[in-house]
Amino acid sequence: MFLKHLTIQNFRNHEELSLDFDSRLIFFVGDNGEGKTNLLEAICILSWLKSFRESEDSNLIRWGSENYFLRGKIKNNLKESVLEIGFTSKPSVKRKLKFNQEEIKKRTDLIGKFITVLLTPMDLKIIEGGPAERRKFIDAFISSFDPFYLEFLLEYNKILKHRNALLKSGNLDISHLSIWDKKIVEKGIFILNKRREVVLELNSFYRVNLDKLSGGKDGLELIYKPNVKDQDEFLEKLNRNLSRDLRLGYTSVGIHRDDLFIGTDQRDITEFGSQGQKRSTVIALKAATFNYYKDILNTIPVLLIDDVIRELDVKRREYFVDLVVTAGQAFFTTTDLEGIQDYVGKLKDQKQIFLIRQGKVEPIK
Protein backbone atom coordinates (compact mmCIF):
# COMPACT_ATOMS: atom_id res chain seq x y z
CA MET A 1 0.00 0.00 0.00
CA PHE A 2 1.05 3.58 -0.71
CA LEU A 3 -0.32 6.90 0.49
CA LYS A 4 -0.04 9.14 -2.57
CA HIS A 5 -1.64 12.31 -1.24
CA LEU A 6 -2.73 13.81 2.09
CA THR A 7 -5.06 16.78 2.61
CA ILE A 8 -5.45 18.26 6.08
CA GLN A 9 -7.77 21.07 7.17
CA ASN A 10 -7.99 22.47 10.71
CA PHE A 11 -6.38 19.44 12.31
CA ARG A 12 -4.31 20.00 15.47
CA ASN A 13 -1.93 22.91 14.72
CA HIS A 14 -2.25 22.59 10.92
CA GLU A 15 -4.69 24.95 9.21
CA GLU A 16 -4.45 23.65 5.64
CA LEU A 17 -2.01 21.26 4.01
CA SER A 18 -1.90 19.45 0.69
CA LEU A 19 1.01 17.01 0.41
CA ASP A 20 1.96 14.69 -2.45
CA PHE A 21 4.10 11.62 -1.78
CA ASP A 22 5.96 9.89 -4.60
CA SER A 23 8.68 8.07 -2.64
CA ARG A 24 8.95 5.04 -0.40
CA LEU A 25 10.54 6.87 2.54
CA ILE A 26 8.92 10.07 3.78
CA PHE A 27 10.56 12.11 6.54
CA PHE A 28 8.84 14.82 8.58
CA VAL A 29 11.66 16.83 10.18
CA GLY A 30 11.31 19.54 12.79
CA ASP A 31 11.84 20.58 16.37
CA ASN A 32 9.68 19.18 19.14
CA GLY A 33 6.26 20.82 19.30
CA GLU A 34 6.15 21.80 15.62
CA GLY A 35 3.49 19.22 14.68
CA LYS A 36 5.45 16.31 13.14
CA THR A 37 3.55 13.67 15.08
CA ASN A 38 0.26 15.42 14.22
CA LEU A 39 0.89 14.46 10.58
CA LEU A 40 1.39 10.79 11.48
CA GLU A 41 -1.72 11.02 13.65
CA ALA A 42 -3.77 12.28 10.68
CA ILE A 43 -2.53 9.34 8.57
CA CYS A 44 -3.38 6.97 11.44
CA ILE A 45 -6.94 8.28 11.63
CA LEU A 46 -7.41 7.58 7.91
CA SER A 47 -6.29 4.01 8.63
CA TRP A 48 -7.77 3.25 12.06
CA LEU A 49 -10.60 5.84 12.16
CA LYS A 50 -9.30 6.94 15.55
CA SER A 51 -6.28 8.69 17.04
CA PHE A 52 -3.51 6.81 18.80
CA ARG A 53 -3.12 9.71 21.25
CA GLU A 54 -6.57 11.20 21.82
CA SER A 55 -9.92 9.61 22.59
CA GLU A 56 -12.07 12.68 21.82
CA ASP A 57 -12.35 13.85 18.20
CA SER A 58 -13.28 17.35 19.36
CA ASN A 59 -9.79 17.76 20.85
CA LEU A 60 -8.25 17.22 17.40
CA ILE A 61 -9.90 20.32 15.91
CA ARG A 62 -7.58 23.29 15.41
CA TRP A 63 -8.08 26.03 17.99
CA GLY A 64 -10.76 28.48 16.85
CA SER A 65 -12.28 26.11 14.25
CA GLU A 66 -15.47 24.02 14.38
CA ASN A 67 -14.38 21.02 12.31
CA TYR A 68 -11.49 19.13 10.80
CA PHE A 69 -11.18 17.33 7.47
CA LEU A 70 -8.75 14.65 6.24
CA ARG A 71 -8.40 13.14 2.79
CA GLY A 72 -6.01 10.43 1.67
CA LYS A 73 -5.38 9.07 -1.80
CA ILE A 74 -4.32 5.44 -1.44
CA LYS A 75 -2.76 3.14 -4.01
CA ASN A 76 -3.06 -0.60 -3.47
CA ASN A 77 -1.44 -2.62 -6.25
CA LEU A 78 -2.65 -0.73 -9.34
CA LYS A 79 -5.91 0.49 -7.84
CA GLU A 80 -6.32 4.01 -6.43
CA SER A 81 -8.99 5.05 -3.95
CA VAL A 82 -9.85 8.12 -1.89
CA LEU A 83 -10.72 8.03 1.81
CA GLU A 84 -12.22 11.10 3.51
CA ILE A 85 -13.01 11.80 7.16
CA GLY A 86 -14.74 14.92 8.43
CA PHE A 87 -15.67 15.81 11.99
CA THR A 88 -17.61 18.78 13.34
CA SER A 89 -18.10 19.91 16.91
CA LYS A 90 -21.64 21.08 16.11
CA PRO A 91 -24.35 18.90 17.72
CA SER A 92 -26.16 18.05 14.46
CA VAL A 93 -23.45 16.09 12.63
CA LYS A 94 -20.42 14.55 14.23
CA ARG A 95 -18.27 12.36 11.97
CA LYS A 96 -18.73 11.68 8.28
CA LEU A 97 -16.81 8.99 6.37
CA LYS A 98 -16.51 8.67 2.61
CA PHE A 99 -14.79 6.10 0.42
CA ASN A 100 -14.48 7.00 -3.26
CA GLN A 101 -17.06 9.76 -2.67
CA GLU A 102 -19.63 7.32 -1.29
CA GLU A 103 -20.77 7.94 2.28
CA ILE A 104 -19.95 5.09 4.66
CA LYS A 105 -22.29 4.40 7.58
CA LYS A 106 -20.48 1.48 9.26
CA ARG A 107 -16.81 1.66 10.19
CA THR A 108 -16.50 -2.07 9.49
CA ASP A 109 -17.03 -1.28 5.78
CA LEU A 110 -13.64 0.49 5.75
CA ILE A 111 -11.65 -2.35 7.31
CA GLY A 112 -8.67 -3.28 5.16
CA LYS A 113 -8.93 -0.25 2.86
CA PHE A 114 -5.79 1.41 4.26
CA ILE A 115 -3.58 -0.60 6.62
CA THR A 116 -0.76 0.90 8.67
CA VAL A 117 1.64 -0.29 11.36
CA LEU A 118 2.60 2.40 13.87
CA LEU A 119 5.69 2.38 16.07
CA THR A 120 5.84 5.08 18.74
CA PRO A 121 7.50 5.52 22.16
CA MET A 122 3.97 5.16 23.62
CA ASP A 123 4.04 1.47 22.59
CA LEU A 124 5.91 0.62 25.79
CA LYS A 125 2.44 0.73 27.37
CA ILE A 126 1.78 -2.65 25.76
CA ILE A 127 4.57 -4.08 27.90
CA GLU A 128 4.13 -2.05 31.08
CA GLY A 129 0.37 -1.44 31.09
CA GLY A 130 -0.73 -4.94 32.08
CA PRO A 131 -3.47 -7.20 30.67
CA ALA A 132 -5.85 -4.37 29.69
CA GLU A 133 -3.27 -2.71 27.40
CA ARG A 134 -2.30 -6.06 25.87
CA ARG A 135 -5.95 -6.94 25.17
CA LYS A 136 -6.38 -3.51 23.61
CA PHE A 137 -3.36 -4.18 21.37
CA ILE A 138 -4.51 -7.61 20.16
CA ASP A 139 -8.12 -6.44 19.70
CA ALA A 140 -7.06 -3.41 17.66
CA PHE A 141 -4.78 -5.57 15.52
CA ILE A 142 -7.38 -8.24 14.69
CA SER A 143 -10.09 -5.60 14.18
CA SER A 144 -7.89 -3.92 11.56
CA PHE A 145 -8.43 -6.81 9.12
CA ASP A 146 -11.43 -8.83 10.40
CA PRO A 147 -14.81 -7.00 10.36
CA PHE A 148 -16.58 -9.96 11.97
CA TYR A 149 -14.20 -9.84 14.92
CA LEU A 150 -14.84 -6.13 15.40
CA GLU A 151 -18.61 -6.63 15.24
CA PHE A 152 -18.48 -9.50 17.75
CA LEU A 153 -16.21 -7.46 20.04
CA LEU A 154 -18.57 -4.47 19.98
CA GLU A 155 -21.52 -6.78 20.65
CA TYR A 156 -19.68 -8.52 23.50
CA ASN A 157 -18.95 -5.19 25.18
CA LYS A 158 -22.60 -4.11 24.84
CA ILE A 159 -23.82 -7.38 26.38
CA LEU A 160 -21.25 -7.10 29.16
CA LYS A 161 -22.51 -3.59 29.93
CA HIS A 162 -26.12 -4.84 30.11
CA ARG A 163 -25.16 -7.79 32.33
CA ASN A 164 -23.20 -5.54 34.68
CA ALA A 165 -26.15 -3.13 34.90
CA LEU A 166 -28.40 -6.05 35.87
CA LEU A 167 -25.93 -7.18 38.54
CA LYS A 168 -25.70 -3.67 39.97
CA SER A 169 -29.46 -3.12 40.01
CA GLY A 170 -30.12 -5.84 42.57
CA ASN A 171 -33.45 -6.62 40.85
CA LEU A 172 -32.22 -9.91 39.48
CA ASP A 173 -34.39 -12.05 37.25
CA ILE A 174 -32.48 -15.32 36.73
CA SER A 175 -34.32 -16.15 33.49
CA HIS A 176 -33.49 -12.69 32.16
CA LEU A 177 -29.85 -13.04 33.20
CA SER A 178 -29.55 -16.46 31.53
CA ILE A 179 -30.47 -14.86 28.18
CA TRP A 180 -27.55 -12.44 28.52
CA ASP A 181 -25.28 -15.28 29.65
CA LYS A 182 -25.96 -17.27 26.48
CA LYS A 183 -25.32 -14.21 24.33
CA ILE A 184 -22.09 -13.24 26.08
CA VAL A 185 -20.76 -16.81 25.80
CA GLU A 186 -21.63 -17.03 22.09
CA LYS A 187 -19.82 -13.77 21.26
CA GLY A 188 -17.00 -14.45 23.69
CA ILE A 189 -16.06 -17.87 22.33
CA PHE A 190 -15.77 -16.49 18.79
CA ILE A 191 -13.41 -13.78 20.10
CA LEU A 192 -11.44 -16.30 22.19
CA ASN A 193 -10.86 -18.65 19.24
CA LYS A 194 -9.76 -15.82 16.97
CA ARG A 195 -7.37 -14.40 19.56
CA ARG A 196 -5.88 -17.86 20.13
CA GLU A 197 -5.35 -18.43 16.40
CA VAL A 198 -3.81 -15.01 15.73
CA VAL A 199 -1.52 -14.96 18.78
CA LEU A 200 -0.13 -18.37 17.77
CA GLU A 201 0.82 -16.98 14.35
CA LEU A 202 2.13 -13.72 15.82
CA ASN A 203 4.35 -15.61 18.25
CA SER A 204 6.15 -17.42 15.43
CA PHE A 205 7.00 -14.07 13.78
CA TYR A 206 7.77 -12.41 17.11
CA ARG A 207 10.34 -15.03 18.13
CA VAL A 208 12.23 -14.74 14.82
CA ASN A 209 12.21 -10.94 15.06
CA LEU A 210 13.38 -10.95 18.68
CA ASP A 211 16.21 -13.38 17.88
CA LYS A 212 17.47 -10.96 15.23
CA LEU A 213 17.21 -7.98 17.56
CA SER A 214 18.81 -9.61 20.61
CA GLY A 215 21.23 -11.96 18.89
CA GLY A 216 19.31 -14.91 20.32
CA LYS A 217 19.80 -13.79 23.93
CA ASP A 218 16.14 -13.09 24.77
CA GLY A 219 14.12 -16.30 24.46
CA LEU A 220 10.76 -14.67 25.12
CA GLU A 221 7.37 -15.82 23.87
CA LEU A 222 3.86 -14.50 23.33
CA ILE A 223 1.31 -16.77 24.97
CA TYR A 224 -2.43 -16.18 24.97
CA LYS A 225 -3.84 -16.84 28.45
CA PRO A 226 -7.65 -16.93 28.27
CA ASN A 227 -9.74 -16.51 31.41
CA VAL A 228 -11.99 -19.34 30.17
CA LYS A 229 -10.97 -22.18 27.86
CA ASP A 230 -14.23 -23.04 26.08
CA GLN A 231 -17.99 -22.55 26.00
CA ASP A 232 -18.79 -25.03 28.78
CA GLU A 233 -16.24 -23.56 31.17
CA PHE A 234 -17.45 -20.01 30.40
CA LEU A 235 -21.06 -20.89 31.28
CA GLU A 236 -20.01 -22.89 34.33
CA LYS A 237 -17.88 -20.01 35.66
CA LEU A 238 -20.66 -17.47 35.09
CA ASN A 239 -23.01 -19.62 37.19
CA ARG A 240 -20.44 -20.42 39.86
CA ASN A 241 -19.44 -16.77 40.28
CA LEU A 242 -22.96 -15.32 40.31
CA SER A 243 -23.04 -14.60 44.05
CA ARG A 244 -19.62 -12.95 43.88
CA ASP A 245 -20.58 -10.92 40.80
CA LEU A 246 -23.74 -9.69 42.54
CA ARG A 247 -21.63 -8.56 45.47
CA LEU A 248 -19.09 -6.85 43.19
CA GLY A 249 -21.64 -5.41 40.76
CA TYR A 250 -19.78 -6.58 37.66
CA THR A 251 -18.91 -9.73 35.65
CA SER A 252 -15.66 -11.15 37.01
CA VAL A 253 -15.09 -13.90 34.41
CA GLY A 254 -14.91 -13.90 30.64
CA ILE A 255 -12.72 -12.96 27.71
CA HIS A 256 -12.56 -9.36 28.99
CA ARG A 257 -10.23 -10.79 31.67
CA ASP A 258 -7.81 -12.49 29.23
CA ASP A 259 -4.08 -11.78 29.23
CA LEU A 260 -1.34 -11.82 26.60
CA PHE A 261 1.72 -13.18 28.38
CA ILE A 262 5.08 -11.85 27.18
CA GLY A 263 8.04 -13.49 28.90
CA THR A 264 9.81 -16.75 29.65
CA ASP A 265 9.61 -19.55 32.24
CA GLN A 266 6.32 -18.22 33.64
CA ARG A 267 7.95 -14.84 34.36
CA ASP A 268 6.45 -11.83 32.64
CA ILE A 269 8.88 -9.36 31.07
CA THR A 270 7.62 -6.67 33.48
CA GLU A 271 9.26 -8.65 36.32
CA PHE A 272 12.78 -8.75 34.90
CA GLY A 273 13.10 -6.90 31.60
CA SER A 274 15.54 -4.03 31.14
CA GLN A 275 14.50 -0.97 29.11
CA GLY A 276 16.54 -2.37 26.21
CA GLN A 277 14.71 -5.71 26.37
CA LYS A 278 11.34 -3.99 26.57
CA ARG A 279 12.18 -1.81 23.59
CA SER A 280 13.31 -4.87 21.61
CA THR A 281 10.08 -6.67 22.55
CA VAL A 282 7.93 -3.77 21.33
CA ILE A 283 9.80 -3.57 18.02
CA ALA A 284 9.65 -7.36 17.56
CA LEU A 285 5.93 -7.34 18.37
CA LYS A 286 5.05 -4.50 16.00
CA ALA A 287 7.25 -6.06 13.31
CA ALA A 288 5.33 -9.32 13.87
CA THR A 289 2.08 -7.53 12.99
CA PHE A 290 3.78 -6.30 9.81
CA ASN A 291 4.86 -9.89 9.03
CA TYR A 292 1.31 -11.13 9.64
CA TYR A 293 -0.20 -8.62 7.22
CA LYS A 294 2.47 -9.42 4.63
CA ASP A 295 2.77 -13.22 4.91
CA ILE A 296 -0.68 -14.29 6.14
CA LEU A 297 -2.93 -11.62 4.61
CA ASN A 298 -0.81 -10.86 1.51
CA THR A 299 -0.96 -7.12 2.21
CA ILE A 300 2.02 -4.81 2.65
CA PRO A 301 1.04 -2.07 5.10
CA VAL A 302 2.42 1.44 5.35
CA LEU A 303 4.87 1.88 8.25
CA LEU A 304 4.50 4.92 10.54
CA ILE A 305 7.54 5.50 12.77
CA ASP A 306 7.30 8.26 15.35
CA ASP A 307 10.68 9.46 16.59
CA VAL A 308 11.81 5.98 17.59
CA ILE A 309 14.94 5.16 15.62
CA ARG A 310 17.23 7.74 17.26
CA GLU A 311 16.76 5.85 20.56
CA LEU A 312 18.02 2.57 19.09
CA ASP A 313 21.53 1.17 19.25
CA VAL A 314 23.36 0.16 16.06
CA LYS A 315 22.12 -3.46 16.00
CA ARG A 316 18.46 -2.53 16.48
CA ARG A 317 18.78 0.27 13.93
CA GLU A 318 20.20 -2.14 11.33
CA TYR A 319 17.27 -4.50 11.94
CA PHE A 320 14.86 -1.63 11.48
CA VAL A 321 16.45 -0.59 8.19
CA ASP A 322 16.02 -4.18 6.94
CA LEU A 323 12.33 -4.05 7.92
CA VAL A 324 11.84 -0.75 6.10
CA VAL A 325 13.39 -2.21 2.94
CA THR A 326 10.67 -4.90 2.87
CA ALA A 327 7.88 -2.34 3.40
CA GLY A 328 6.10 -0.62 0.59
CA GLN A 329 6.22 2.84 2.14
CA ALA A 330 7.34 4.28 5.48
CA PHE A 331 6.75 7.64 7.17
CA PHE A 332 9.17 8.90 9.82
CA THR A 333 9.23 11.80 12.24
CA THR A 334 12.60 13.01 13.48
CA THR A 335 14.35 16.09 14.85
CA ASP A 336 17.63 15.01 13.26
CA LEU A 337 17.94 16.06 9.62
CA GLU A 338 21.61 15.08 9.46
CA GLY A 339 20.92 11.59 10.85
CA ILE A 340 18.43 10.58 8.17
CA GLN A 341 21.12 8.98 6.03
CA ASP A 342 21.86 6.50 8.84
CA TYR A 343 18.59 4.67 8.37
CA VAL A 344 17.62 4.93 4.72
CA GLY A 345 19.90 2.01 3.86
CA LYS A 346 19.70 0.97 0.22
CA LEU A 347 16.77 3.33 -0.38
CA LYS A 348 18.70 6.63 -0.22
CA ASP A 349 17.40 7.63 -3.67
CA GLN A 350 13.80 6.87 -2.71
CA LYS A 351 13.21 9.47 -0.02
CA GLN A 352 11.28 12.71 0.44
CA ILE A 353 11.96 15.16 3.24
CA PHE A 354 9.49 17.73 4.58
CA LEU A 355 10.55 20.44 7.03
CA ILE A 356 7.90 21.39 9.61
CA ARG A 357 8.31 24.86 11.10
CA GLN A 358 5.73 27.21 12.66
CA GLY A 359 2.77 25.30 11.24
CA LYS A 360 4.18 25.23 7.70
CA VAL A 361 5.30 22.08 5.90
CA GLU A 362 7.84 22.59 3.11
CA PRO A 363 9.59 19.97 0.96
CA ILE A 364 13.40 19.91 1.07
CA LYS A 365 15.00 19.15 -2.27
UniProtKB/Swiss-Prot annotation:
Task: State the GO CC annotations.
Answer: cytoplasm
Q: Where does ATP bind?
A: 30-37
Q: Which Gene3D superfamilies match?
A: P-loop containing nucleotide triphosphate hydrolases, RecF/RecN/SMC, N-terminal domain
Matches recorded under SUPFAM superfamilies: P-loop containing nucleoside triphosphate hydrolases
Principal place of residence? cytoplasm
Which superkingdom heads the taxonomic lineage of this protein's source? Answer: Bacteria
Name where it's found.
Cytoplasm
Any Pfam family matching the protein:
SMC_N
Alphabetical UniProt keywords: ATP-binding, Cytoplasm, DNA damage, DNA repair, DNA replication, DNA-binding, Nucleotide-binding, SOS response
**What is a GO molecular function of this protein?**
ATP binding
Task: Choose any GO biological process term that the UniProt entry carries and state it.
Answer: DNA replication
Function, as annotated, reads: The RecF protein is involved in DNA metabolism; it is required for DNA replication and normal SOS inducibility. RecF binds preferentially to single-stranded, linear DNA. It also seems to bind ATP.
Protein family:
Belongs to the RecF family.
Q: What is this protein called?
A: DNA replication and repair protein RecF
UniProt organism field: Leptospira interrogans serogroup Icterohaemorrhagiae serovar copenhageni (strain Fiocruz L1-130)
According to the entry, what is the taxonomic lineage of the organism?
A: Bacteria, Pseudomonadati, Spirochaetota, Spirochaetia, Leptospirales
Originating gene: recF
